[in-house]
Amino acid sequence: MDCYAEELVVPNYQESSSETYPSTGMWGGWSMSSPEAAEKCFDYDGFNGEGMMYSQMSMRTSEEEEESKRSKAFYGASSLHDFEGIEQMDDMFLSSILEDVPEDDGDVHRATSSNNSVGSSSMYGGGREVPMFHCHDMSFKEEAPFTISDLSEENMLDSNYGDELSSEEFVLQDLQRASQKLTDETRKCFRDTFYRLARSSQDKSDSVSPNSEELLMQTSRYDYGDGNRFSREEEIESETNSIDRAVANLTFNKMESNISNFPLSERVQ
């Protein structure tokens, strides 16, 4: 029969025991599995002859200690295994990301565990080398440098650019550029040539026109009031010569070919 002494529950089989500590066979009575010790569990330390009993309360049972030892052993043994599992999950996540990136030009590669391979890296964890995946930078097509000269060439090659300047302006610019390269004697020669060619073409047109007499009267009337022009026309030969024909051939017959062969970038400055 159990007895109660100062809120201490003592099993009945401990009343006749003279031993200070309970035996190993009686340890089951102190466990949490026994109905007597469902609420409290004590470690019986000693009992003297004068009736003084010393006890020490402990909140840790043998099962808790064993569970603690097992958990420590489990976590100590599986720490590396857990790291490998996390590492495997990271690799799966990174590989799923790499699968979404297009690999048309071979710009995306997986790094190998070799330290000599270019673009690969690794980390050390748990005493072992763990390979990591890397995404190389996507290579883009290099564009040609854009300069101001390219812009000017594009503007000149534009089809709408020819509408801004008329043919007379092009001819005037060409004549100005050509006259700057000629000497004074050459410019005078060209001037006289153009006068003779113009007068020769006018004489031919007057001979064909039915109202040639009226045109001659008008021209003579205009020439009578202009003494400088009349004196200059006297110096000009009335008939064309070989130089005039050469200039006419160079100017009129070869004009289209010369304009097409002449660089457009030099024609407009």
Swiss-Prot record:
InterPro entries named in the record: LNK
Source organism, top-level taxon: Eukaryota
Disruption phenotype annotation: No effect on circadian clock.
GO biological process: circadian rhythm; regulation of DNA-templated transcription
Keyword Thylakoid attributed: no
Keyword set, alphabetical order: Activator, Transcription, Transcription regulation
Induction: Repressed by members of the TOC1/PRR1 family of clock genes.
Oligomer status and interactors: Interacts with REV8.
Function field: Probable transcriptional coactivator.
Protein name per the record: Protein LNK3
Organism: Arabidopsis thaliana (Mouse-ear cress)
Taxonomy of the source species: Eukaryota, Viridiplantae, Streptophyta, Embryophyta, Tracheophyta
